[in-house]
Amino acid sequence: EVSDILYRGHSQFQDIIVADSKEFGRMLVLDGVFQTSIKDEFMYHESIVHIPLFLHPNPKKVLIIGGGDGGAAREAVRHPEVESVTMVDIDGQVIELSKKYFPEISKAILEKDPKLTVKVGDGIAFMREAENYYDVIIVDCSDPVGPGEGLFSYDFYKDTFKALKEDGLFVQQTESPFMHRKLVKDIFDC
């Protein structure tokens, strides 16, 4: 149940709502789909970041595609062995609104953490240019519709594989593997 709408607008890419609710606290909603909230964001961000960073033997260079709320970046810069985190999000408005309405999530961006570089741009195009560079790539994106659709394509996964170092790890928010079997197959086919 929403108690207050703090922001309702439209960026170049999507509809954006920031609202308060009794159950989840402040929430970010993109194109009508819940993305994150103050009260439970840690479960998602800690899982998508810490698991691959603890599994990799030496994760120095991390790339985050998406992640405009800043939560994945906040968690990645906490690892002492990580030297650099590059975050590329297509929607600069989500980044700015997150800094304003979700300062505890976007802490690393707000504090200009020296390990973090934030780029507003197309993550698909960015990935095409990288080769054998990243130890860990995290794709923290919305569902496979709208601006996130291309992040679930076979070509994107091929480019991701090329951008990883030989021992690199890749993690992506992919919805349920039972509901999206083709997506899981495309990932493993790369």
Specify the residue positions occupied by each region the protein language model found.
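N-terminal auxiliary segments of SAM/dcSAM-dependent transferases
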Residues: E1-M27
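The AdoMet/dcAdoMet-binding core of the Class I SAM-like
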Residues: T36-I187
